[in-house]
A protein has these predicted regions:
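A detector for small-residue-rich transmembrane helices and their helix-helix packing motifs
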Residues: 2-280
Length: 280
C-alpha cells in the first residue's frame, strides 16, 4: 500500500486542465462543416449543459464549498494511488470515479468557457461521425486517459486535477483526423479573424501541447492531461467511427451558374447522406 500521508483537508492549489492551453493563441468561432448523419448533436448539448450546471452548483455556496467540491470530485493522484487520503468530510465518491468526475469541474468562468467553446465548435461533427452513444463513450474515455497520464507523470501529487480539456483534446484530435481540410473561422491572438483549414490550426494547437509538456509549461496547467486526451482521441476515433466514415473529409464546393451566366464556385450544403455514411 505504501506510507500514507496525513489526511488532505485543504488543497487550494489546483492543477487545471485548460481547454485553450496555449493562452489566447486562437479562439475557435465556427466551422464550415454540416452534419451528415444525425439531426442534432444531443450529446454535445448535454455535455455542455452538465458542465455549466456543475460549475454553477459548485460555486453558488462560496469559496469553502467550491474547495470542498474540488477535493471531493477532483482527480488527486496520491489519493487514487492510495498514498494519501482525504479527510472524511471531503469523501463524496469512490476515488476511482474521480477519473471521470474531475472533467466536469472548472476553476472559473474562463476555464469553463474556453473548454465549452472548443466542444461547441468541434464536438458536433465528431458526434456525427461516431454516433451518439459511441461519442459519449469516446468523450469519457479521453477524460480518463487524460487523468491516467497526469497520474502517471505526477503520481504523488496532492493537487486536484480539474477541467474538461483531457476530453476536449481528444475531440480536437478526432476532428483533425476526420476533417483536416474543413475551413475553421478563428480569432488568432484573440483579435485577428481568419478562416483556415483545420489541418493547420488544429495541428499547430496539438503540436503546442507536446512542446509545452516537454518544456514544463505553466505550473498550474496539466499538459500531461492534454497529451493523454490527444493520444486517446487519435486511437479511439479510428476504432469508434461509423462504418464508411472517411478520414480525410472536406467541404463540398461545386460549380454553379451565376446570375450573369458565368460559372462560380460556391459552398453548398452536402447532399443527403449516402448509404455508407448515413443515419443509424
Amino acid at each position: 500500500m505504501g506510507a500514507r500521508q496525513e489526511p488532505l483537508t485543504a488543497s487550494l492549489r489546483r492543477a487545471r486542465a485548460e481547454g485553450t492551453g496555449t493562452g489566447l493563441m486562437f479562439i475557435p468561432l465556427y466551422d464550415s462543416n454540416h452534419l451528415r448523419s444525425i439531426s442534432l448533436q444531443y450529446v454535445t448539448f448535454a455535455l455542455i449543459a452538465i458542465n455549466v450546471l456543475v460549475y454553477l452548483s459548485t460555486t453558488v455556496g462560496g469559496e469553502q464549498f467550491t474547495n470542498a467540491a474540488m477535493l471531493g470530485l477532483g482527480f488527486i493522484p496520491s489519493v487514487v494511488h492510495d498514498t494519501a487520503e482525504l479527510a472524511p468530510q471531503f469523501v463524496v465518491i469512490p476515488a476511482k470515479l474521480s477519473y471521470v468526475s474531475y472533467a466536469f469541474l472548472h476553476a472559473d468562468i474562463f476555464h469553463l468557457g474556453g473548454n465549452m467553446l472548443f466542444l461547441w465548435v468541434f464536438g458536433d461533427n465528431v458526434e456525427d461521425a461516431l454516433g451518439h452513444v459511441r461519442y459519449l463513450a469516446f468523450y469519457l474515455a479521453c477524460a480518463v486517459a487524460g487523468a491516467l497520464v497526469h497520474g502517471f507523470i505526477a503520481p504523488d501529487s496532492q493537487e486536484p486535477l480539474i477541467g474538461a480539456s483531457g476530453a476536449i483534446a481528444g475531440v480536437v484530435t478526432a476532428y483533425l483526423i476526420l476533417f483536416p481540410r474543413v475551413k475553421v473561422w478563428i480569432l488568432a491572438f484573440a483579435r485577428i479573424p481568419l478562416r483556415i483549414p483545420a489541418y493547420i490550426v488544429l495541428a499547430v494547437w496539438i503540436l503546442s501541447q507536446f512542446v509545452l509538456f516537454l518544456m514544463g509549461g505553466e505550473d498550474q496547467i496539466s499538459w500531461a492531461c492534454h497529451i493523454g486526451g490527444i493520444l486517446a482521441g487519435a486511437v479511439l476515433v479510428l476504432v469508434l467511427r461509423r462504418r464508411g466514415v472517411p478520414l480525410d473529409d472536406e467541404e463540398i464546393v461545386v460549380p454553379v451558374a451565376a446570375d450573369a451566366g458565368q460559372p462560380a464556385a460556391v459552398e453548398v450544403p452536402p447532399p443527403a447522406p449516402a448509404p455508407r455514411w448515413g443515419r443509424r
